[in-house]
Amino acid sequence: MLTLRAPAKINLFLLITGRNESGFHLLDSVFCFTHDLYDEIIIVPTSATENSVKFIGASQAIGADNSVSRVLRFVNDYAKRYFNVTLVKNLPVAAGIGGGSADAAALLRYFGGLHNISEVLLSQVALSVGFDTLACLYSHPCHVTGMGEKIVALPESKLVYPILLVCPNFPVSSAEVYKNFRERRSIFSAESNLAGDHQAFEDMLSLPNDLTDAAIEIAPVISDVLKSIKNCKGNKVTKLCGSGPTCIGVFDTVENLRDAHSELIRHHKWWVKIAHISL
């Protein structure tokens, strides 16, 4: 038996810079990953000729054709091996923090090492699972452009940043948010011009998330979450993470961060967590 960790994905900003010939949106974002907030994946090989996948603690129902099952089917074809997988969902489902992508990426990392699968093939499988999965496969601070396939690693400092994550118990489809963005906006953002250089944490956070209005239109509760975080003492930055509905809060002191955590838990039935990232 083996247990893997699949950390949450955090977008410090998310710019939509255009669309490609196939109509897919092009993004410009920096991804970071939480040190202390993750799904847990328990893997047990089986002599059976089929996989079993069990989810524990999922905030929403997860269909049979999910990111974990897709990776397992790839491993079945590649290595002719089957597994019983139990996934402890500490991250909310369809929440904009890459839970499904992170789960798939953690499995790909493990099976890639176990069966000496080439990096090129792993990358192809990751992109076939989801646009965030490739960045989650590396699970290191990175500048992501294109459809998620262009990744430049950022030098990770020893600085650790505490953040507040708040998710209303309301799943949001990334596809629906991008569709809504396409229907309501025709002007795209300029690229951030990071070019892989290390930038200050605050500078990156000052850049917007272009999906915010589109996400709020689908899930108005996001606006309530953003306002609630912003109204907490010592709040410096409040923004949507990914396509939502999870929102990020950054505070001037750890004490104010902890107070905000306690206050939001006391007044709302939301998923509220303190996590730490490096950049």
Swiss-Prot record:
Q: What is this protein called?
A: 4-diphosphocytidyl-2-C-methyl-D-erythritol kinase
Molecular function (Gene Ontology), one example: ATP binding
Q: Offer one example of a GO biological process linked to this entry.
A: isopentenyl diphosphate biosynthetic process, methylerythritol 4-phosphate pathway
Q: Which residues form the active site?
A: 9, 132
**Annotated catalysed reactions:** 4-CDP-2-C-methyl-D-erythritol + ATP = 4-CDP-2-C-methyl-D-erythritol 2-phosphate + ADP + H(+)
Q: What does this protein do?
A: Catalyzes the phosphorylation of the position 2 hydroxy group of 4-diphosphocytidyl-2C-methyl-D-erythritol.
Against Gene3D superfamilies, the record matches this protein to: 3.30.230.10, GHMP kinase, C-terminal domain (3.30.70.890)
